Each structure stands twice: as structure tokens, then as C-alpha cells.
Regions:
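N-terminal secretory signal peptides that target proteins for export/translocation
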Residues: 1-7
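N-terminal export leaders
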Residues: 9-14
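Hydrophobic helical h-region of N-terminal Sec-dependent signal peptides
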Residues: 16-21
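C-terminal segment of classical bacterial N-terminal signal peptides
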Residues: 22-29
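Pepsin/retropepsin-fold aspartyl endopeptidases
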Residues: 29-426
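Intrinsically disordered, low-complexity sequence elements enriched in Ser/Thr/Gly/Pro
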Residues: 7-8, 28
């Protein structure tokens, strides 16, 4: 008797299930990430949920290597992490996938700028119309910016005063002056009279800076041959030359974050000093171990643009929000956005007060607020509303809740570690 080779219905079902299992194990049954997943990743980025966004961007890029949005998203986040090599790889890929888009070009310029490769960064900024910045960066063709010519591993500079904002002595081209410390500023700002005294020659092109209240002011640019900060002697330091004295302080200039992040630095408010350390991996490990042993709060942060440090905090229990760590707010510790004003139920007086920012007069409305940054809490911190430039809350492509400043940090020694991307407060 002949045996039929036609499989039974039960056998066919078993074969079908086995095939499905094989496909499942190989991952072939998973659908490719599409527009919805990319939109979800972009939304996470806008919310400041960068680690979650990065995981989704990476998944999309793995399944669709031609995804411009995923490559750009990964490049943005690696730059926020200050992971420059990884950022460069992703941003170059994004540029290859969509050469007409400007953002990869801008962010690649930022990678090179942070790395100190100024001459290579210049064409990127020039192509974006930032002619003044490009001209300054070209001046570094045969120079190493922020070259530490001499100095110890650690140097402490006493504050001349601590309030309303810390001031230190800085020597430029052999001339000593008094400078504010302000992480809300970018490079070394030198006021007109002291610039002339120290022989700083402005380059041809000027641009405009944005200051409190959205005010703008013209800036020229220059290059300082020598700068002394405590026991550190630096050469080839980029300089911003404000075209008007500006601001309420009689100082010779401002030391901004681009100068400070050449070091692993501490603003030691209780002891009235700025501590500068060589910015090495070994120093980073040592400082973290010392800080943790001393019970310091460890607060992760992100770096946007050339000087915008962001960390998570709350206001009156609302949030969390990403706050810009800008230590240069005299007389206050917080400036909030309209969104935080409403969500934190902050009440304002009917009449504002007049103040001065880098771009001129600013009207703001004072209040007090309970704040946290990481796990650090300060109650009844003096805040202001009205001093934030329009569009500030989404200027970097993600939502910010405002600025956290001097009045919050005044009780602490605050260490900025751009290797570990963490603040240490003790």
C-alpha cells in the first residue's frame, strides 16, 4: 500500500509555528523603526530625556542606517555628553546623509571648537554666516589656544570679593585687572579701557551678544598673547571685547566658562576662592573620590553650545526642569520661564524693579522660591522673573525651566568636572 506524502493538518501547524519561532529568534519579525519612533525620540529629546532619546535613536540607526534624524539625534546627544569623538562620528554621518542641512555643520564646528582645533572650526562657522567668530578662530592658524605654559597641578585664587558676585585678579599681557567669574559668559570678556591698557587689538569684524532681558550689545574680538590665572600662565587666549562698558559692576572684565573649562575648577564660596586644577582623567578621578568621601552631592550635567551647563532641578516641588547653571546673577539665585512661573505657582508683585544686564536696563519682578538641584535643596531663594531673553526656554532645542545662580550656590563649594560631566556640591 502506498503512503501519502501530504502532511497532516497538525503537522502543517507545527511546521508553521517552528518557522515563526526561528524568525522571532533571528529578530526578523521585528518591524523596522519608522517615522513614529523617530518622532518619539525627537519628543524625548525636546523634553530633555536625553538618555532615553539616545537609546531610541541608536535602535533606529541600527535598523535604518540611512536615517538622517537618528544620526543627527545621536550627534546632538553625544555633544551634550561632551563625548566629542562620538559626536563627530554621528554628525559626519548626518552631514553625508543630508548635505544641505545646516545643523550638522554647526554642531561639527562646535565639536572642533571645544576640542581646541580653532583653525579647523573656522570654515564651519564662516559657512553659517558667523563671520566674527570665524575670523577670530582663523587667527589661531599657528597657535594652540589656552596653552598652559607653566603652572602646578592645582592653584587657588582668592576672591577679591564674594558678593554680589565673586571677583578675582587676572593678568593680561602683563596688566593686572579685576574680573568677575560668571559661568553664564563664554570666553574671556575684557572691557574697553582695560583692553586698551593691555594692548588688545580688535579684529575687523564685530557681532552681537544676547544678554538679560533679550537685550543685545555689539562685541569685537581679539587674542591675548598671555593670561595669568593664579599660578597658571596661559598663552593664546581668545577674547571678547564688549563695545560698551555695560553692567552694574566696575570691573575690568569677566571670566567665562570657556576659560574655566580648560580646568577642573571649584567655586569655593564659603572659603572665598577659585580653585583651578589641571583637567586630566587622573585629576577627575581623584576629585570625584575626594568629593564623594566628603559627602558632596554629585549632580550630572549636560553641556550645550559653548558654555551652557544644564542640570535637573525643581521649583516649589514642580518639575523636574533643566536649569541653566549661570552663576552670574547678582542679588538672586533663580530666573524662571513663564511655564515654571505657572506650574510652580509663583506669585509676583505688581511692580517690577529696574536692573542692569550686559545689554542695558532690564525690568524684573522679584519673588522667593524653594529650589532643588539634584538632591540639594535650598528654601526661600530669591528669584526674578522677566530677565530671560525671549525664546530662551527652547533655545537649545530642548525645554529649560530657567537659570539657577549665585544665591542658590552661595553656601557651597561647587566643583565643575567636564571629564565626568558632574557637579560636586559640598
Amino acid at each position: 500500500m502506498m503512503t501519502s506524502h501530504k502532511p497532516s493538518r497538525r503537522a502543517a501547524i507545527l511546521l508553521m509555528l517552528a518557522g515563526a519561532a526561528i524568525l522571532s529568534l533571528s529578530g526578523m519579525d521585528r518591524p523596522l523603526c519608522g517615522p513614529q519612533e523617530l518622532s518619539r525620540a525627537d519628543d524625548l529629546y525636546r523634553q530633555g530625556r536625553f538618555d532615553e532619546a539616545a537609546r531610541l535613536y541608536a535602535q533606529i540607526a541600527a535598523q535604518d542606517p540611512a536615517s538622517y534624524g537618528a544620526a543627527l539625534g545621536m550627534g546632538r546627544i553625544q555633544l551634550l555628553r561632551n563625548s566629542l569623538s562620538e559626536a563627530e562620528t554621528w554628525l559626519k554621518k548626518a552631514r553625508e546623509l543630508n548635505p544641505q542641512e545646516r545643523e550638522p555643520q554647526a554642531l561639527l564646528g562646535e565639536v572642533l571648537y571645544r576640542r581646541g582645533d580653532y583653525a579647523a572650526a573656522a570654515p564651519f562657522f564662516e559657512s553659517l554666516g558667523q563671520k566674527a567668530k570665524a575670523e577670530k578662530l582663523k587667527a589661531f592658524q599657528d597657535r594652540t589656544p589656552f596653552l598652559i605654559e607653566s603652572g602646578p597641578d592645582v592653584s587657588a585664587l582668592p576672591f577679591v570679593v564674594t558678593d554680589p558676585l565673586p571677583q578675582i585678579k587676572v593678568t593680561i599681557n602683563g596688566q593686572e585687572g579685576t574680573f568677575l567669574i560668571d559661568t553664564g559668559a563664554w570666553e574671556l570678556h575684557v572691557m574697553p579701557a582695560f583692553a586698551e591698557k593691555s594692548g588688545l587689538k580688535p579684529l575687523a569684524t564685530t557681532d552681537k551678544g544676547i544678554y538679560a532681558g533679550g537685550r543685545t550689545a555689539s562685541n569685537a574680538h581679539s587674542l591675548a598673547d598671555s593670561v595669568r590665572l593664579g599660578d597658571f600662565a596661559l598663552r593664546n587666549v581668545p577674547v571678547v571685547l564688549p563695545q560698551s562698558p555695560g553692567g552694574p559692576f566696575q570691573v575690568d572684565g569677566i571670566v567665562g566658562t570657556v576659560v574655566l573649562y580648560q580646568f577642573l575648577f571649584t567655586l569655593d564660596y564659603p572659603k572665598g576662592r577659585l580653585i583651578l586644577r589641571r583637567n586630566t582623567p587622573e585629576m577627575s578621578k581623584s576629585v570625584r573620590a575626594e568629593s564623594e568621601a566628603a559627602g558632596a552631592a554629585v549632580i550630572p550635567f549636560w553641556l550645550a553650545g559653548d558654555h551652557f551647563v544644564y542640570a535637573w532641578g525643581t521649583a516649589n516641588g514642580a518639575g523636574p526642569y533643566l536649569f541653566f547653571v549661570d552663576t552670574g546673577l547678582a542679588g538672586g539665585g533663580f530666573i524662571c520661564t513663564e511655564r515654571v512661573l505657572k506650574e510652580a505657582k509663583i506669585e509676583l508683585p505688581k511692580e517690577g524693579i529696574q536692573g542692569m544686564g550686559g545689554g542695558g536696563a532690564v525690568t524684573s519682578y522679584p519673588f522667593t522660591v524653594d529650589l532643588t538641584l539634584g538632591k540639594v535643596r535650598r528654601d526661600k531663594v530669591r528669584g526674578m522673573y522677566g530677565a530671560i531673553p525671549p525664546g530662551f526656554d527652547e533655545r537649545q532645542g530642548f525645554r529649560s525651566g530657567g537659570i539657577i545662580s549665585h544665591g542658590f550656590f552661595r553656601a557651597f563649594a561647587v566643583t565643575f568636572d567636564f571629564q565626568a560631566m558632574a557637579l560636586y556640591l559640598k
